[in-house]
Swiss-Prot record:
Organism for this UniProt entry: Erwinia tasmaniensis (strain DSM 17950 / CFBP 7177 / CIP 109463 / NCPPB 4357 / Et1/99)
Gene3D superfamilies membership: 1.10.8.60, P-loop containing nucleotide triphosphate hydrolases (3.40.50.300), Winged helix-like DNA-binding domain superfamily/Winged helix DNA-binding domain (1.10.10.10)
Subcellular location(s) of the protein: Cytoplasm
Entry's free-text remark on domains: Has 3 domains, the large (RuvB-L) and small ATPase (RuvB-S) domains and the C-terminal head (RuvB-H) domain. The head domain binds DNA, while the ATPase domains jointly bind ATP, ADP or are empty depending on the state of the subunit in the translocation cycle. During a single DNA translocation step the structure of each domain remains the same, but their relative positions change.
Gene: ruvB
Class of enzymatic activity (EC top level): hydrolase
Protein name: Holliday junction branch migration complex subunit RuvB
Location of the region described as Large ATPase domain (RuvB-L) in the Swiss-Prot/TrEMBL record: 4-184
Length: 334
């Protein structure tokens, strides 16, 4: 799959998880960026602790790589409770969810990543658990089957999703707190990269951190990945020095340009500009032109390009914007 091969993919790569845990902020005081979310969560957490209550159920949504799992960990740490982690696709049966819920201590946090992928059967079990702290369990089979209710301790469910619109209304309505994570500003990413470098003991200059931040597509996960690749380049080609110039040379070598675009982003944009005179072009024609599946374009390639104003999605197809022409130094005809 193309996403796993891209340096600027916002998806998590398995070997990164151990390093990411080591550099992940643990408390709100260490959490950089998302000022509105940070301020609101600080108030909600303190209020819940003052009352001696569990925090209201929390839904976190936004593009991948922006720190939804990090925020869930911070909530548990701030509340001083345990965090149990799972994901929507893993919870195949109602019993899978019941096993997690019955092992929670009072005020514990249950974090469900990709919550939009819960099966309807599991979701039905979740409703009374969230609303009334009760678990309905079927005992036996056939005519002899009966339902019993188990009381659960007060707990906090944190759901994370990249597709909030895919959640059913009954599930979405049961979250008392809803937070959207936005793409990060360059200055916040610079701070994050600098902190990560310090945690890893890397001699990264302020200029080097800024260069990485500029090309990280507003995403901390990508910024930390680029930091590690710049480190590799610096160790082999620059005697370990991680200056702005070294970072720029490293990222140029890796074909990550000033906007954070890689070869696939450029291939897509240039296909629209060169092969279809800027568009509009239908998705199937565009997919054939660059040799990719339409799902790859829709889910992987174009979201960031649209968000940054390089592609416009119209009823007649995709169009390259003036911003895209300017990026490549191409004069738009007509």
């Amino acid at each position: 799959m193309i996403e796993a091969d891209r340096l600027v993919s916002a998806g998590v790569i398995s070997e990164e998880e151990v390093i990411d845990r080591a550099i992940r902020p643990k408390m709100l005081a260490e959490y950089v960026g998302q000022p509105v979310v940070r301020e609101q969560m600080e108030i909600f957490i303190k209020a819940a602790m003052m009352r001696g209550d569990a925090l209201d159920h929390l839904l976190i949504f936004g593009p991948p790589g922006l720190g939804k799992t990090t925020l869930a960990n911070i909530v548990a740490n701030e509340m001083g409770v345990n965090l149990r982690t799972t994901s929507g696709p893993v919870l195949e049966k109602a019993g899978d969810l019941a096993a997690l819920l019955t092992n929670l201590e009072p005020h514990d946090v249950l974090f469900i990543d990709e919550i939009h992928r819960l099966s309807p059967v599991v979701e039905e079990v979740l409703y009374p658990a969230m609303e009334d702290y009760q678990l309905d369990i079927m005992i036996g089979e056939g005519p002899a089957a009966r339902s019993i209710k188990l009381d659960l301790p007060p707990f906090t469910l944190i759901g994370a999703t990249t597709r909030a619109g895919s959640l059913t209304s009954p599930l979405r309505d049961r979250f008392g707190i809803v937070q959207r994570l936005e793409f990060y500003r360059v200055e916040d990413l610079q701070h994050i990269v600098g902190r990560s470098a310090a945690c890893l003991g890397l001699p990264l200059s302020d200029e080097g951190a800024l260069e990485i931040a500029r090309r990280a597509r507003g995403t901390p996960r990508i910024a930390n990945r680029l930091l590690r690749r710049v480190r590799d380049f610096a160790e082999v080609r620059a005697g370990g020095e991680m200056s702005g110039d070294v970072a720029s040379r490293a990222l140029d070598m890796l074909s990550v340009d000033s906007e954070g675009f890689d070869y696939m982003d450029r291939k897509l944009l240039l296909a629209i500009i060169d092969k279809f005179t800027g568009g509009p072009v239908g998705l199937d024609n565009l997919a054939a032109a660059i040799g990719e599946e339409r799902e790859t374009i829709e889910d992987v390639l174009e979201p960031y390009l649209i968000q940054q104003g390089f592609i416009q999605r119209t009823p007649r197809g995709r169009m390259a914007t003036q911003h895209a022409y300017k990026h490549f130094g191409i004069t738009r005809e007509g």
